[in-house]
A protein has these predicted regions:
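A detector for short, charged/polar N-terminal pre-domain segments
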Residues: 1-10
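Short, charged recognition helix plus adjacent turn
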Residues: 2, 60, 71-75
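Short amphipathic helical patch at the helix-1/turn junction of helix-turn-helix
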Residues: 9, 20-21, 49
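Short basic helix-loop element that most often maps to the first helix and adjoining turn
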Residues: 13-32
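Conserved hydrophobic/aromatic packing and binding residues within compact polymer-binding modules
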Residues: 15, 29-30, 40-43, 69
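Recognition helix of helix-turn-helix/homeodomain-like DNA-binding domains
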Residues: 34-48
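DNA major-groove recognition helix of helix-turn-helix/homeodomain DNA-binding modules
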Residues: 53-68
Length: 75
């Protein structure tokens, strides 16, 4: 798997894990982060590459730090 794909997959797994821990649906997290649910789905599946604004919105909506979202993600 190319390095970029691994990075996106790991980030997506982190988002999904924190979302599950928070008891949020994709719909609710997307609403809280002000992004489209299908975009969030793509992030969680590792097929979308979110920009810094989206990463910050997700972190805020999940009540975690950007560092926590990026844990284990190696560029």
């Amino acid at each position: 798997m190319p390095k970029r794909d691994k990075l996106l997959s790991e980030f997506g797994r982190n988002v999904s894990r924190f979302r599950d821990q928070a008891g949020l649906s994709q719909e609710k997290l997307a609403e809280n982060a002000e992004i489209d649910r299908t975009y969030l789905s793509g992030i969680e599946r590792g097929v979308r590459n979110p920009g810094i604004k989206t990463v910050l919105r997700l972190a805020r909506a999940l009540h975690v730090t950007v560092d926590q979202l990026c844990k284990g993600v190696e560029a």
